[in-house]
C-alpha cells in the first residue's frame, strides 16, 4: 500500500467515525415537537393591570419631578414609593400592566400560575391558545410557595397531564412553554441542574433548578418532562442583568398541587408550626456539640405557648430528623414541618447534651395561614406581618425602653422579614404610636395604610433601629 493510499484510507476512516458520532449524537438529542403540539393548547398567557398611586417627589436637584428613568432602571419602579411623602408632594393614579404565564388544570376553567404574577391585580385577563381572551377570578394565592389559582368561565378546556416531581433526576431533559416578554407560546429546553434547592426567603419550596431559558413573562408557565407531563411551575431566575443567566427555578408540581387543592377546597392553606426560632449549625457549633459534621436545625428560642415548648423541646436542641427524614440544614425544617397538617404528630430526632433522643410533637397551625382571595379573619393580626410576638416579661425591659413586645418568630417570606425584622427584636413603636401589648399591636396593624411605608422602631442588642414597613396588599 502506497503512502498516498494509506493517507486516503485513514481520511475515510476518520470521516466515517465523525459521521457516526454525529448520527449517534443526533439520535440522543430529544425531539420536543410532539410534546409542544399536545401541550400548547393548555398553556395560557396572563395579563394583569392595577392602579397605583405614584408621587412626584421633590427629589434633590430634580425639583419635584419624578425620579428619572435612568435611576428607575437601577433602583426599580417602586424606589420612590418606599419613601414617606413629604409636605407638598403631589401624587397621581397610574395604571401598571404586567405579563405572565399559566396552564389549565381542569376542563371547567381552573388555571395555575405564580402568586407574584397576579399580586395586587385589579383585573386579570387570560388569553387562550384558540384566540379567546377571558376575564379571570382569583380563587386564592399563597405567597409562601408563590402559587395562585385562577378561574375562568369556560367549559371543555384542554388540560395538561401532571407528573410526579418525586421521581426527578439531575441531568434529565425538560422543556418550558411560556410568554417571555409577551411572546406567547415560546418553547425552551434544557436539563435539570439540581433538585431540592432552597432559596433565601423561600423555605417552603424545594426548588427544581434547571438551565432552561426563563425570562420575565415565563413566570407561572409549566415545566415538562419528556413524557409531556408537568413536573413544575417556572417561578424565578437568578440574574445580575435582569435576564436569563443559566439559573432557573421551578416549583415542584407536587408542592404546587397540594397548595392549589387547599385553595380550591378550603380557601386557605394550612401549615404545620412548631413555634421555634432556629439557626444554622456551623462547623464550630457542630464541633462543640460533638457532631461529625454540620447538619440539622439548632433551636435558639421557643414560643412558650407553642407546640414545641408544650411537648418538651428545649433551646439548644438540634433537630436532626422529622419522621425519619433527615434535616440536612436549618432551612429544611420549616419545609418539612410546613407540609404536616396541623393537629398531626411528628417524631423528631434531636441531639440534646450530646445524646440522641426522640420527641413527639403535635404540630400546630401557623398563625398566619394564608387566606383565599379577598382575605378573611385574622388579616389584621400580627400574623399579617409574618411574625409572632409575646409580651415583655419581668427583667426583659431595658433602661432605654419602657414598652414594646418581643418578636419570637419571623416568617422568612413575610413583610416583616423583608423589612429586616428578626426574631428576638423588641418592637417598640409603629409610626408615632408606642406598642404596649400584642393586642394593641393587632389594632395598630389593622389601621396601617397599604399605599405607603411606615417607620417601625426596633430595639436590638442594646440599640434602637428604624426600618420601613410596607404591608402586602390584600
UniProtKB/Swiss-Prot annotation:
Key words of the record: Hydrolase, Periplasm, Protease, Repeat, Serine protease, Signal, Stress response
Record's keyword annotation contains Signal: yes
GO cellular component, one term: outer membrane-bounded periplasmic space
Reactions it catalyzes: Acts on substrates that are at least partially unfolded. The cleavage site P1 residue is normally between a pair of hydrophobic residues, such as Val-|-Val
Molecular function in Gene Ontology: serine-type endopeptidase activity
Function, in words: Might be efficient in the degradation of transiently denatured and unfolded proteins which accumulate in the periplasm following stress conditions.
Pfam families: PDZ_2, Trypsin_2
Signal peptide bounds: 1-26
Cellular localisation: Periplasm
Lineage of the organism: Bacteria, Pseudomonadati, Pseudomonadota, Gammaproteobacteria, Oceanospirillales
Active site annotation, chain numbering: 116, 146, 219
Protein name: Probable periplasmic serine endoprotease DegP-like
Protein EC: 3.4.21.107
Residues the record lists as binding substrate: 217-219, 274-278
Family designation: Belongs to the peptidase S1C family.
Biological-process GO terms, alphabetical: proteolysis
Residues of the PDZ domain: 263-354, 360-462
Amino acid at each position: 500500500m502506497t503512502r498516498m493510499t494509506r493517507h486516503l484510507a485513514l481520511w475515510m476512516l476518520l470521516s466515517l467515525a465523525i459521521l457516526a458520532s454525529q448520527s449517534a449524537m443526533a439520535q440522543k438529542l430529544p425531539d420536543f415537537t410532539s410534546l409542544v403540539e399536545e401541550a400548547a393548547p393548555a398553556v395560557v398567557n396572563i395579563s394583569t393591570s392595577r392602579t397605583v398611586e405614584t408621587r412626584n417627589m421633590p427629589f434633590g436637584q430634580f425639583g419635584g419631578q419624578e425620579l428619572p428613568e435612568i435611576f428607575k432602571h437601577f433602583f426599580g419602579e417602586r424606589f420612590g414609593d418606599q419613601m414617606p411623602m413629604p409636605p407638598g408632594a403631589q401624587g397621581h393614579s397610574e395604571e401598571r400592566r404586567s405579563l405572565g404565564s399559566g396552564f389549565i388544570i381542569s376542563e371547567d376553567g381552573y388555571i395555575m400560575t405564580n402568586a407574584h404574577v397576579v399580586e395586587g391585580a385589579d383585573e386579570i385577563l387570560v388569553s387562550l391558545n384558540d384566540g379567546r381572551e377571558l376575564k379571570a377570578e382569583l380563587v386564592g394565592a399563597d405567597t409562601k410557595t408563590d402559587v395562585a389559582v385562577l378561574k375562568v368561565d369556560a367549559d371543555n378546556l384542554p388540560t395538561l397531564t401532571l407528573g410526579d416531581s418525586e421521581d426527578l433526576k439531575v441531568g434529565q431533559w425538560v422543556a418550558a412553554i411560556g410568554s417571555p416578554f409577551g411572546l406567547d407560546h415560546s418553547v425552551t429546553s434544557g436539563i435539570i441542574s439540581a433538585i431540592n434547592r432552597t432559596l433565601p426567603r423561600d423555605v417552603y419550596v424545594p426548588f427544581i433548578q434547571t438551565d432552561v431559558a426563563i425570562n420575565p413573562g415565563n413566570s407561572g408557565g409549566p415545566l415538562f418532562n419528556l413524557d409531556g407531563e408537568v413536573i413544575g411551575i417556572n417561578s424565578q431566575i437568578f440574574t445580575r442583568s435582569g435576564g436569563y443567566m443559566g439559573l432557573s427555578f421551578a416549583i415542584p408540581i407536587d408542592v404546587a398541587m397540594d397548595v392549589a387543592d387547599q385553595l380550591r377546597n378550603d380557601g386557605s392553606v394550612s401549615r404545620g408550626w412548631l413555634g421555634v426560632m432556629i439557626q444554622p449549625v456551623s462547623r464550630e457549633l457542630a464541633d462543640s456539640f460533638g457532631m461529625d459534621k454540620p447538619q440539622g436545625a439548632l433551636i435558639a428560642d421557643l414560643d412558650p405557648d407553642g407546640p414545641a415548648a408544650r411537648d418538651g423541646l428545649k433551646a439548644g436542641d438540634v433537630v436532626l430528623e422529622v419522621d425519619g427524614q433527615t434535616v440536612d440544614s436549618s432551612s429544611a425544617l420549616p419545609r418539612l414541618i410546613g407540609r404536616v397538617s396541623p393537629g398531626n404528630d411528628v417524631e423528631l430526632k434531636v441531639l440534646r447534651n450530646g445524646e440522641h433522643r426522640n420527641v413527639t410533637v403535635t404540630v400546630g397551625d401557623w398563625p398566619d395561614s394564608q387566606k383565599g382571595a379577598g382575605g378573611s379573619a385574622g388579616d389584621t393580626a400580627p400574623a399579617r406581618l409574618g411574625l409572632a410576638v409575646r409580651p415583655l416579661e419581668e427583667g426583659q425591659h431595658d433602661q432605654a425602653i419602657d414598652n414594646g413586645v418581643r418578636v419570637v418568630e419571623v416568617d422568612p417570606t413575610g413583610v416583616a422579614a423583608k423589612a429586616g425584622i428578626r426574631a428576638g427584636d423588641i418592637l417598640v413603636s409603629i409610626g408615632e404610636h408606642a406598642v404596649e401589648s400584642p393586642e394593641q399591636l393587632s389594632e395598630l396593624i389593622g389601621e396601617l395604610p397599604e399605599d405607603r411605608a411606615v417607620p417601625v422602631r426596633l430595639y436590638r442588642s442594646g440599640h434602637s433601629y428604624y426600618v420601613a414597613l410596607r404591608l402586602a396588599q390584600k
